[in-house]
Amino acid sequence: MNSKQQKKYFVGIDISKDSFDATLIDEFQKKLFYQKFEMNKSGFKSFLQKLEKFDKVLLQITVESTGVYFISLYNYLLNTGFSISVINPLLVHNFHKSMSLRKTKTDKKDSFIIALFTLKNPEILSKHSKQTSTMKRLCRERDKISEEIAKVKTEIKSDLNVLFPELEKHIDPFTKSMLLFLEKHSSANSIRKLRTTQIDAIFNKTKGNKVRMKSVELKKLAKDSIGNGDKYLEKVLSSKIRRLKLYQELNKEFDLEISSFIEQNQSADFDILTSIKGIGKITAQKFLIEVDNIRNFNNHKQLTAFMGTDPSLKQSGTSIMYQGRISKRGNKYLRKTLFQMAVSCIRNDSTFNAYYHKKRDEKKKYKQAVIATGNKLLRVIYSMLTKENYYCESYR
């Protein structure tokens, strides 16, 4: 964004579900207006009328990335030509603490603090694209769908263990051809009644992922099966297979959208990040979308605090003690992603493997050692992305 010498007016917006509070200050920290507005079209128009008294070129607006509530207002202001940034609430919180202000919480003061933060910290404000926040939601939805896929696969295996227990030992039940077949004929009892030509006809309907078993072999396996035929359980299994296929289609659709977004917006960072052994496509995408722009953080400690993998502190009087636990105050999705990346890097990279075992030798528990390795990984990632360097195993 433009430097603070070029901006003369700063608006902080504190948003809730049904309303938002806005404070506008000038470059001398003088409060020019404060007002509460309804979170609807009428409220948006009233706010716009207030802002139109000031030159857009000289005005900088900032909102906190609080849940999903800010997105509609953010897009509305962006479409009307205002310069607007989205800021991590943790940065505002830390700024607030550093100002030694009273601990009473009011929305009026919150919007003023955001405006003051905007004035004092122009270099770390970022202009998000319209898609940034919604892309995070899409990425998180893909995670949920992946979890549902794993869950329904487990349920399908459980049902097959009753209806056709021998099947999984001889063939993968999750190929396209086999799923199509089992959707129609969900038990050994049902398969026994089919002719081999009927089995072949179903297998030949799909392209790729062909069943590696001849129809005559499948029929014999069904004939010798100890599985129990149950028309109600067969309907349940058929329903779960249809659900699995739907989840897989959604997952594929979301994957294409996310890959396209990364290619258009963060391809250079993606290539750098995946140069680390153990960081694959999915985790790299999740990390980059959740962080959004790693250059918004002045150092790796800010990034660690944003994730919530920094050590928690306990203060008593003038003494500050490290608790040994992580604070968990930051982005839980990033914490999960970092943990996944750390586990994979421990398995695939000698540097992180050695660091993990060093922590284990220091009597750290498994999870503690992985988190410590994750924080080391985070330091490396921060350095790589901000300096635009690819990884090598001697990287420190």
Residue ranges and their predicted role:
Residues 1-396:
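A detector of single, family-specific signature residues
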